[in-house]
Amino acid sequence: MTAMEFLPVLFMVTGIVLVAAATLFVSSLLRPSNPYPEKNAPYECGMEAAGEAAGGRFRVPFFILAILLVVFDVEAMFLFPWAVVLKEIGFVGYIEMFVFMLLLLVGFAYAWLKGALEWQE
């Protein structure tokens, strides 16, 4: 394929970026700007926030598990197509996937040793 065949795609991407930037710029000019403290306060079911949620930081352990889930889901996305074409790619493909899985395993072991999977503080 030549570079000229990608020219319409370049125009389309450029147009999309320009329209998005123009929309954000115009909306920032037109919207009212009236900051007040109540706007930034946490709101839950019409009740005043109390305790740690009233402005302090609190620990949410679920985000680490969510990140690990995404990482290993991406691994599975690479692993299934690799298993389908294993005979065609041969030994080199096997070694590449082994290195990929080894790197993920090292990262998982690091997270485990650092206590990222522990629920108690």
Swiss-Prot record:
GO MF annotation list: NADH dehydrogenase (ubiquinone) activity; NADH:ubiquinone reductase (non-electrogenic) activity; quinone binding
Record-annotated membrane-spanning stretches: 6-26, 60-80, 89-109
Enzyme class: translocase
UniProt subcellular location: Cell inner membrane
InterPro entries in the cross-refs: NAD(P)H_OxRDtase_bac/plastid, NADH_UbQ/plastoQ_OxRdtase_su3, NDAH_ubi_oxred_su3_sf
UniProt keyword annotations, A-Z: Cell inner membrane, Cell membrane, Membrane, NAD, Plasmid, Quinone, Translocase, Transmembrane, Transmembrane helix, Transport, Ubiquinone
Predominant cellular place of this UniProt entry's protein: membrane
Cellular compartments per GO CC: NADH dehydrogenase complex; plasma membrane
This enzyme's EC code(s): 7.1.1.-
Membrane topology of this protein: Multi-pass membrane protein
Record field: catalytic activity: a quinone + NADH + 5 H(+)(in) = a quinol + NAD(+) + 4 H(+)(out)
Pfam families according to UniProt: Oxidored_q4 (PF00507)
Entry-linked PANTHER family: NADH-UBIQUINONE OXIDOREDUCTASE CHAIN 3
Described purpose of this protein according to its UniProt entry: NDH-1 shuttles electrons from NADH, via FMN and iron-sulfur (Fe-S) centers, to quinones in the respiratory chain. The immediate electron acceptor for the enzyme in this species is believed to be ubiquinone. Couples the redox reaction to proton translocation (for every two electrons transferred, four hydrogen ions are translocated across the cytoplasmic membrane), and thus conserves the redox energy in a proton gradient.
Subunit structure, interactors included: NDH-1 is composed of 14 different subunits. Subunits NuoA, H, J, K, L, M, N constitute the membrane sector of the complex.
Protein family per UniProt: Belongs to the complex I subunit 3 family.
Protein name: NADH-quinone oxidoreductase subunit A 2
Record organism: Rhizobium meliloti (strain 1021)
Lineage of producing organism: Bacteria, Pseudomonadati, Pseudomonadota, Alphaproteobacteria, Hyphomicrobiales
